[in-house]
């Protein structure tokens, strides 16, 4: 019996991609139906440990130096001396998983440079409903304790259930990484371990952004807004974000490390993460004043300017408003005017939540969201940015329809007919290769779809389209970041989004997410795999010149037929005489495929009429090859191969194109023999499929015997 371990890595990747797509269609990967990371089922593993009376030890993230990291966190580094892995019960007498009085100030950073993760975890504590989506309840060091815990983390479009054992790195009986200030709670330390397992090691956590952590804890889309150059609809954007229960943070950026944790004259802390939690309009001195509520999660130091707890402005508003909004406590919560907010803080960060994160909440409105997973593959779908027009068209393409305009703005004199759209492009798995490849420079371009291309789906726009039409919008900049996004306001209509790397020929996987205020439709814009039945060639005696006819008779056997070997010699002599065409000749494999294509009686040979048909086809294929060989090099590049195969009658979608290029190109170069080998293989596979799909359903059912016969023959 064939074992999965016997299958090559390339085949495993293809099988994994197909299986992943099938599971996604069944709803696996949503929060309520998360993937079991590393195929580890928490309930099953815990039950097995309880049955055996053992404590769980995770084989995929062992209590070994390699789980901590390399270089500065390697086993020989200064930081990692005298490190021991201990379970919480070995550290303190009565450990708790999580208590009800958690707050951001309970979480302390260790020796690891992951303050960004610390801030994201702290933000979760301000929103218990989100926290308990990540940290499932009913976990304990007492009832059914087996040394195993689990967490739910979002990664690149899918929720994962990540299992860890509770062995944690310690020195002198104290945790060396994230820990609780009062030492009793261990949920934050174990959550950090689950995140480290997901990306490979603790060391891979060094360096990041708070928004990256918030995205992986919520599945939301994050955006940064510099407040020195805010968008024109800044106040509306804030109101909409709060209506949609978005998580928001603000800060005063620093340019020098010496400024971190220093205070302004109004008691705001530089380099400090604040939360934006509310927005209210109050009547003050006969006009409407917009106030913003800010929370300092890390301490009790508060703003002491206008509208602070003890400010005189509160004496001039109605008593009802004062009672409703003002709470004179040093609890980190305070109000300030919108103008003071804009002039004192320099950065606003927003994490827009997906509808599934809000499904049990009270909210006024929510985003409509869709996401697509895709890839850029060298030689097929990695076309680079618009600076590379010869290959830009080959990038994945996505169409979005925006039929409904936003609701009118209450505070605006002119109500534009626009659709708000948040587009976010994220590259996958960059932390997993932290010691190797780094982040690629990525971005996207948006084109308005002209009328003649609207309502089309089974099409991949080619080079001519992008040379003719201008883009309608674009990401702020192509940047080497995990994610780039743009908050756009577009007229109703259809648009095409082209995500790409800046340079062509860069391999990567990506996630494209689109958030809209109103209903929208999005879909992948791609060719359907299709075989066009071209008109069969009619041949006459004039299609072969006298020399070629004589050569056939010399090569043929007594029955007037040529086999694969004779055809090989015959074709190589004849193609050598073709004018303005370079070729190294045909391989035996291609000759075998040609015979399979035209051999009607199953003899494995071709008689004269069949050869005449073949020769006419070959001349047509050579013309297609020359037409697509734009630089007249005698070869096609892998992008031209897709166009040539299409001209020959076969359309391929991006996934099939990626496989074909990987199989039949040599460093993105395709000679005539490889082109024909690929085309004939595709044509044979289409013929087999269509003959089996008698009801034209687009799918067939094969047993192992039929599968092996067809694939081995093809």
From Swiss-Prot:
It is found in: Cytoplasmic vesicle, Secretory vesicle, Acrosome. Residues 528-543 are annotated as: Linker. Residues 544-713 are annotated as: Domain IV. InterPro entries: C2_III, Calpain_cysteine_protease, Calpain_domain_III, Calpain_III, Calpain_III_sf, EF-hand-dom_pair, EF_Hand_1_Ca_BS, EF_hand_dom. One of its GO terms (cellular component) is acrosomal vesicle. Belongs to the peptidase C2 family. This is Calpain-11. It comes from Mus musculus (Mouse). The gene is Capn11.
């Amino acid at each position: 019996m064939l074992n999965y371990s016997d299958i090559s890595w390339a085949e495993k990747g293809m099988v994994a991609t197909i299986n992943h797509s099938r599971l996604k269609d069944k709803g696996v990967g949503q929060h309520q139906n998360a993937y079991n990371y590393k195929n580890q089922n928490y309930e099953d593993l815990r039950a097995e440990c309880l049955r055996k009376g053992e404590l769980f030890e995770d084989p995929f993230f062992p209590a070994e130096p390699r789980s901590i990291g390399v270089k500065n966190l390697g086993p020989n580094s200064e930081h990692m001396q005298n490190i021991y892995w201990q379970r919480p019960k070995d550290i303190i007498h009565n450990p708790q998983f999580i208590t009800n009085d958690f707050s951001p100030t309970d979480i302390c950073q260790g020796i690891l440079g992951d303050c960004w993760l610390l801030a994201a975890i702290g933000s979760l504590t301000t929103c218990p409903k989100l926290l308990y989506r990540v940290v499932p309840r009913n976990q304990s060091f007492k009832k059914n304790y087996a040394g195993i815990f689990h967490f739910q983390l979002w990664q690149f479009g899918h929720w994962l259930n990540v299992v860890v054992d509770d062995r944690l790195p310690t020195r002198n009986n104290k945790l060396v990484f994230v820990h609780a200030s009062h030492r009793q709670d261990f949920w934050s330390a174990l959550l950090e371990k689950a995140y480290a397992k997901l990306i490979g090691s603790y060391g891979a956590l060094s360096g990041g952004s708070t928004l990256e952590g918030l995205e992986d804890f919520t599945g939301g889309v994050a955006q940064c807004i510099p407040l020195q150059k805010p968008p024109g609809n800044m106040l509306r954007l804030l109101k909409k974000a709060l209506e949609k229960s978005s998580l928001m943070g603000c800060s005063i950026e620093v340019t020098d490390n010496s400024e971190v944790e220093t205070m302004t004259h109004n008691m705001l802390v530089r380099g400090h993460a604040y939360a934006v939690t509310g927005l209210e309009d109050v009547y003050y001195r006969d006009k409407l004043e917009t106030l913003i509520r800010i929370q300092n999660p890390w301490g009790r130091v508060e703003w002491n300017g206008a509208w602070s707890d003890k400010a005189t402005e509160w004496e001039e508003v109605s008593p009802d408003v004062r009672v409703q909004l003002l709470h004179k406590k040093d609890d980190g919560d305070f109000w300030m005017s919108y103008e003071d907010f804009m002039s004192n803080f320099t950065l606003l960060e927003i994490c827009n939540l997906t509808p599934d994160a809000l499904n049990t909440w009270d909210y006024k409105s929510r985003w409509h969201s869709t996401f697509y997973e895709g890839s850029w593959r060298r030689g097929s779908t990695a076309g680079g940015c618009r600076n590379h027009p010869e290959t830009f068209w080959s990038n994945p393409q996505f169409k979005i329809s925006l039929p409904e305009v936003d609701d009118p703005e209450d505070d605006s004199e002119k109500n534009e007919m626009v659709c708000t759209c948040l587009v976010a492009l994220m590259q996958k798995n960059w932390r997993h290769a932290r010691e190797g490849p780094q982040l690629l420079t990525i971005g996207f371009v948006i084109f308005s779809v002209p009328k003649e291309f609207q309502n089309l789906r089974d099409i991949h726009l080619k080079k001519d389209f992008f040379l003719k039409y201008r883009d309608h919008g674009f990401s702020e900049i192509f940047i080497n970041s995990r994610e780039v996004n743009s908050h756009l306001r577009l007229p109703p209509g259809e648009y095409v989004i082209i995500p790409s790397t800046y340079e062509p020929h860069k391999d990567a996987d990506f996630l494209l997410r689109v958030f809209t205020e109103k209903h929208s439709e999005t879909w992948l814009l791609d060719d359907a795999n299709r075989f066009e039945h071209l008109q069969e060639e009619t041949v006459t005696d004039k299609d072969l010149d006298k020399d070629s006819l004589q050569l056939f008779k010399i090569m043929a056997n007594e029955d007037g037929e040529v086999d694969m070997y004779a055809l090989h010699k015959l074709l190589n002599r004849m193609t050598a005489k073709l004018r303005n065409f370079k070729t190294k000749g045909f391989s035996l494999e291609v000759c075998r495929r040609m015979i399979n294509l035209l051999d009607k009686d199953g003899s494995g040979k071709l008689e004269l009429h069949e050869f005449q048909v073949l020769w006419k086809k070959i001349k047509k294929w050579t013309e297609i090859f020359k037409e697509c060989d734009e630089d007249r090099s005698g070869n096609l590049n892998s992008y031209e191969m897709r166009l040539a195969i299409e001209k020959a009658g076969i359309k391929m979608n991006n996934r099939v194109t990626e496989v074909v290029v990987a199989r039949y190109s040599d460093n993105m170069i395709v000679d005539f023999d490889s082109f024909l080998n690929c085309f004939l293989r595709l044509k044979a596979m289409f013929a087999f499929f269509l003959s089996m799909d008698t009801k034209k359903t687009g799918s067939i059912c094969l047993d192992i015997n039929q599968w092996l016969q067809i694939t081995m023959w093809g």
